[in-house]
Amino acid sequence: MSSLSGKVQTVLGPVEPSQLGRTLTHEHLTMAFDSFYCPPPPCQEAASREPIMMKNLFWIQKNPYSHQENLQLNQEVEAVREELLYFKAKGGGAVVENTTTGLSRDVRTLKWLAEQTGVHIIAGAGFYVDATHSAATRAMSVEQLTDVLISEILHGADGTSIKCGVIGEIGCSWPLTDSERKVLQATAHAQAQLGCPVIIHPGRNPGAPFQIIRVLQEAGADISKTVMSHLDRSIFDKKELLEFAQLGCYLEYDLFGTELLNYQLSPDIDMPDDNKRIRRVRFLVNEGYEDRILMAHDIHTKHRLMKYGGHGYSHILTNVVPKMLLRGLTERVLDKILRENPKQWLTFK
């Protein structure tokens, strides 16, 4: 294992796990999502090019991936800085920033945000989904991909000495592509060498999380140090969810604040609202999985920032936690989900 054993690696360097506090395990602070632009509905093309204004926020909220400017979160560094200060004032301590290669990762800005706010920021190593893989990435062997992941954690990312502290979010489609499968295998190999945390973005199909865990297991990954993201939009059947939970990974509900009638990235999926997410978390707690649950918002577009009338990075702490208490979850359980579980996951073995 690496010299990071027993530590959490932030963009400002290793810290003691006890320093993290309440942690959001799946967010984006600076990124570009323009690779996933969705054409607007018929006769609404002009709306996709207008500046973000009060009068068109309703349209953007309903069509977030059809507005060009909305996909450029990396234009809002100052707004994100202000939001992180607000998050800290509300009791937040750390954010895992899941932007990887393919989403315009910017570790320099992450370091600046950490310095400016005092919030611990953990950067993500690796590659997003196949649609963002370069020809060079697709041409790499598993061994070469493994070397890239290890280097981003031990030496620095994006030509800097700023080091990542997790592998991921590793992007996967449904079904997996050959390039994504290689990246998963490399992720397992790097994790085996480093003892580091891993976080996965599954394809939008109930079978995707199962397929990914199988690939990781076969390649030697430590599933107990691995997070499966986006379960709110992936596995809906309770029996199937319990079957997946038995595999031993962390179960992440990370779309809090997202309440959509039509989910543009997968129209067949009925996106749950926060009340349903709370009930699903309570279900998992009652089934004995409180040690495996994580929560976040996965903010990746402008309209979800408070600057544009969105819920922001403090939504879970200010709004969701009180509702969870009202629904019978205890302070002890919520402390485990927001503090202890992230700490255990992020600590290098």
UniProtKB/Swiss-Prot annotation:
The keyword Transport does not apply. A divalent metal cation 2 binds at residues 169, 201, 230. Binds 2 divalent metal cations per subunit. It is an enzyme of class 3 (hydrolase). This is N-acetyltaurine hydrolase. Expressed primarily in proximal tubules of the kidney. Belongs to the metallo-dependent hydrolases superfamily. Phosphotriesterase family. GO terms for molecular function: N-acetyltaurine hydrolase activity; zinc ion binding. A divalent metal cation 1 binds at residues 26, 28, 169, 298. Its cofactor is a divalent metal cation. Keywords: Cytoplasm, Hydrolase, Metal-binding. The lineage of its organism: Eukaryota, Metazoa, Chordata, Craniata, Vertebrata. One of its GO terms (cellular component) is cytosol. It is found in: Cytoplasm, Cytosol. It comes from the Eukaryota. InterPro entries: AryldialkylPase_Zn-BS, Metal_Hydrolase, Phosphotriesterase. The gene is Pter. N-acetyltaurine hydrolase that regulates feeding by catalyzing the hydrolysis of N-acetyltaurine into taurine and acetate. N-acetyltaurine has anorexigenic and anti-obesity effects that are dependent on GFRAL receptor and GDF15. PTER also acts on other N-acetyl amino acids (Met, Ile, Leu, Val) and N-propionyltaurine, but at lower rates. Binds resiniferotoxin, a vanilloid that desensitizes nociceptive neurons.
